[in-house]
UniProtKB/Swiss-Prot annotation:
Gene this chain is encoded by: petJ
Protein name: Cytochrome c6
Residues annotated to bind heme c: C38, C41, H42, M89
Keywords: Electron transport, Heme, Iron, Metal-binding, Photosynthesis, Signal, Thylakoid, Transport
Transport as UniProt keyword: yes
Subcellular location: Cellular thylakoid lumen
Length: 117
């Protein structure tokens, strides 16, 4: 009986340690958020207001706070930018849910890191 309990506890501990996180960003859902909220200025990864500040990987590395200095992952830096805005870009925190922001950040990171723009 003790052996069975030990095995069960080991299995449960493994599931909790390596299981799926409570919330994983969804790039496919982020594509929908992007189309509805971002594409007016950022269609195709471009920037209609500041043409040099595109969503392409090389551009993001030069201007995106937190990402350019390595203190944040690309997704974290994009989520921060979307939430708080900067310059001509409005803040979407409060207008989009945290899940929508995480999803759109995952979408933008996927597009940039895989040269899909």
């Amino acid at each position: 009986m003790k052996k069975l309990l030990a095995i069960a506890l080991t299995v449960l501990a493994t599931v909790f340690a390596f299981g799926t996180p409570a919330f994983a960003a969804d790039a496919a859902a982020g594509a929908q958020v992007f189309a509805a909220n971002c594409a007016a200025c950022h269609a195709g990864g471009n920037n209609a207001v500041m043409p040099t500040k595109t969503l392409k990987a090389d551009a993001l590395k030069t201007y995106l706070a937190g990402y350019k200095d390595g203190s944040k992952s690309l997704e974290e830096a994009v989520a921060y930018q979307v939430t708080n805005g900067q310059g001509a870009m409005p803040a979407f925190g409060g207008r989009l849910s945290d899940a929508d922001i995480a999803n759109v950040a995952a979408y933008i990171a996927d597009q940039a890191e895989n040269n899909k723009w």
